């Protein structure tokens, strides 16, 4: 907000608001981004990319645990760790937008984007997973694709691993319900986008 005001754009935006007929939404992937966007006049979020939420601390560890799991039970165990983190992010985003529309896109990129590439990180992951470095490298190599844009991602990922989409959908709906209970005057309707259909 200070940037906008210091550059004299605040008055420009206010004048434009008198004449425009379009609503302006923003891209925001964190509660902080959403809050800043709202302060700058955004009237909702047009795209919240959930994959950006997975790259921090314990989240990336749980995401990698899910990717490296050999069966659905292992994936569900890792996803159970991610569920409260995702729900908390969505609650923060809904709160920041004060009941305005929020479109949340379910996981889109291929899984290889979440695995480490540096040798030290691969070694640490192998140790944490109780696997050898060669086993981890084999899994990572198996995830890489010739053309990731047309490969195993988006809705195709959700078909192969429906538990991922289920966890994210559950997180969105629970967050919306929790925020709606706290703000019964808001007409909070979460918008869920299925990627790359």
Locate the predicted segments by residue.
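Single conserved hydrophobic/aromatic residue that forms the stacking wall/gate
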Residues: 2-13
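Conserved alpha/beta-domain cores
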Residues: 14-197
């Amino acid at each position: 907000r200070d940037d906008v005001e210091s550059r004299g754009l605040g008055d420009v935006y206010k004048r434009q608001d008198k004449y425009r007929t379009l609503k302006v939404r923003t891209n925001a992937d964190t509660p902080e981004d959403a809050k800043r966007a709202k302060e700058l006049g955004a009237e909702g979020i047009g795209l919240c990319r959930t994959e950006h939420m997975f790259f921090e601390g314990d989240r990336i560890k749980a995401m990698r645990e899910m990717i490296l799991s050999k069966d659905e039970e292992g994936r569900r165990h890792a996803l159970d760790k991610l569920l409260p983190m995702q729900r908390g992010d969505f609650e923060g985003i809904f709160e920041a937008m004060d009941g305005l529309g929020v479109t949340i896109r379910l996981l889109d990129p291929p899984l290889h984007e979440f695995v480490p590439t540096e040798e030290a990180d691969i070694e640490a992951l192998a140790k944490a997973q109780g696997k050898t470095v060669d086993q981890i490298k084999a899994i990572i190599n198996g995830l890489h694709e010739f053309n990731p844009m047309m490969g195993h991602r988006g809705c195709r990922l959700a078909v192969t691993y429906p538990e991922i989409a289920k966890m994210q959908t559950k997180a969105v709906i629970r967050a919306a319900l929790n925020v709606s209970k706290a703000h019964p005057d808001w007409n909070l309707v979460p918008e869920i986008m299925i990627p790359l259909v």
